[in-house]
Amino acid sequence: MISINERAQESASLIKLYVMGAVMQEIQNGNLEMNDTTKHLLDEMITVSDNSATNELVRYLNKDHDHKKGMKKVNAFIKAQGFEYTHEYNGLEDTSLWYDADTKNTTSAKDCGRLLERIYRGEFISHLASRQMEELLLNQQVTYKIPSTIPSESRVANKTGETSDCENDAAIVYTPKGDYILCIMSCEVSSKSSAVDSLQEMSSLIYSYFMNRDTSKVSRQVEATAKETD
């Protein structure tokens, strides 16, 4: 994993990746049921980034339907999973759920990348949960950032995040020549359109690298390394 300028940044809707994980953990533990309502809320939270659905799922994490207590469960899950730069301080959009209005929810590109890698490998919560989360991300409707420059021959499973001065995206990209994970966060930007342009350009360059790289050379390097470690 390559990480550049690793630090906590405003998560915007990337925090929903961790809410999704916390909900799936509670389902795995038998404390929540994967019923039609839960499925609908998860779908709304991930595929169209609905804030009300997110707040409701956080409430579901507490037996009394208390959002603040549910949020503590999200943060306990985040800590237990080892995501160093991620924390949910406030609910989304609804100001009555802002408990620390001067502090923004945070994550990092590396934390998001590690989460997506574990989903990709089938190791996040469980293999079944990983596949369910991957399917939600593959059905993403907000695709104007990383996916926008990816040809139709490849698939993208992504989750975006945006505020008045943030443009974030975290994605698994599946290509004919190898899959990769790309997470880009740009916050405190003066021009959102320029930030999106830069994000799209980076996505295009990285995709081109993966499609045009000398895979035979990579294979030879892997084989040589394997022999050295025998």
Give the location of each predicted region.
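Short, well-structured active-site flanking segments
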Residues: 25-43, 126-130
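Active-site-proximal beta-strand/loop segments in catalytic clefts of secreted hydrolases
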Residues: 46-49, 57-61, 83, 89-93, ...
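Extracellular/periplasmic catalytic domains that process cell-envelope and extracellular macromolecules
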Residues: 34, 106, 150, 163-165, ...
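Mid-domain, small-residue-enriched loop/turn segments at the edges of structured enzyme/sensor domains
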Residues: 54-121
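Active-site SXXK
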Residues: 8-32, 45, 182
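Sec-exported extracytoplasmic/periplasmic mature domains
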Residues: 20-29, 46-51, 58-63, 75, ...
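Structured C-terminal helix/loop/strand segments within mature extracytoplasmic catalytic/sensor domains
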Residues: 114-144, 155, 165-230
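Acidic helix-start/capping segments at beta-turn-to-alpha-helix junctions
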Residues: 35-54, 59-63, 93-96, 220-225
